[in-house]
């Protein structure tokens, strides 16, 4: 039995999200913004399928992580995440953006993993178990950065993640987490 699509997706979400911490800590702000714009442009090429016939191996890799409903616009959720991360870099301090990235990568990743595999109590298209997984995992991951405020940020993040909305939570969560970190 192979690894489920949802497990692959969420593992990629967690690791890919946390990977943003490397340029955040090692590049000057101007280089960070240029790098982020490059990533967004590349991501947009994938979503719009502008080079699919030229880089088929990359698309085959992308399709390993993509849900059936997103095959027309592959990597669209990654684009939303990368846009939210870019705006966090642009508008918030490095420390605040770190909180937004960790909240999104860890909280949303574990909410999806637990909710998909163990979720029984449904709240719309999400689950109560996923909500608690978001809260617990992001509280633990954020504690070294913000101490007890991790509980508040994790709770607000879990609420944002579970509520039905027209805006992708991969876009909202980095901004919400970054803003909360700067406020407290």
Predicted regions and their residues:
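Hydrophobic alpha-helical transmembrane segments
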Residues: 1-184
């Amino acid at each position: 039995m192979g690894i489920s699509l949802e497990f692959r997706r969420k593992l990629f979400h967690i690791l890919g999200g946390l990977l943003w911490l490397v340029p955040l800590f090692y590049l000057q702000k101007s280089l960070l913004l240029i790098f982020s714009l490059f990533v967004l442009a590349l991501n947009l090429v994938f979503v719009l399928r502008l080079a699919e016939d030229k880089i088929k191996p990359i698309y085959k890799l992308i399709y390993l992580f993509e849900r059936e409903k997103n095959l027309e616009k592959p990597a669209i959720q990654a684009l939303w995440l990368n846009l939210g991360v870019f705006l966090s870099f642009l508008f918030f301090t490095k420390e605040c953006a770190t909180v937004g990235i960790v909240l999104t990568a860890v909280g949303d990743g574990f909410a999806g993993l637990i909710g998909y595999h163990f979720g029984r109590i449904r709240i719309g298209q999400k689950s109560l178990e996923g909500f608690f997984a978001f809260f617990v995992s992001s509280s633990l991951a954020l504690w070294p950065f913000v101490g007890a405020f991790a509980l508040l940020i994790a709770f607000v993040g879990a609420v944002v993640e579970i509520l039905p909305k027209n805006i992708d939570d991969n876009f909202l969560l980095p901004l919400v987490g970054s803003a909360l970190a700067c406020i407290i």
